[in-house]
Amino acid sequence: MNHEPQPDTMSAEEYIRQGGSETDWDDVPDDANGLSEEFMTEFQDILNWDWVSCIQSNLTEDMIRKFQDKVNWDWVSTDRALSEDFIREFRERVNWKKVSQFQTLSEDFMKKHQDRIDWEYASCHQKMGEDFISEFKCYVDWDHISRYQVLSSGFIEEFAPYVPRDTAFPQDHCPIQ
């Protein structure tokens, strides 16, 4: 009789419970993004936290806080929307390159954390106003600013020395609106 867990016939929690520390994480059923907090607490010592941090869509800020020494902070910084308060609280743990690329940050937050922001990624992925860009002209990546931010012709003229000469300002495909 085969006592191997059958991923097609059981929930992720059942599969992990039955497999224990021998769980094949590649075979965990698709409902894995619904592991309960109680389940994660009970099995915290055998869960693959890289896998949980990447796959678990209902991993809330409170759950991340509870399991802060177990989660993979690169995945946490990438795969879920984090509040600025949460990022501030865990500023020593988050991956700032990923935060600058994947989180939505206010200009005020970027100003307060200017030494942590990855300006190359922020210049491409964060919405920045002309006043903000002007204030941080020595930090921003002008190639990305000229490609991905909406800039007025007056601003372009004023900051012409910073703007790469070969830039055609393809703002019609700007990912930031």
Regions found by a protein language model. Give the residues of each.
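Alpha-helical scaffold segments
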Residues: N2-Q177
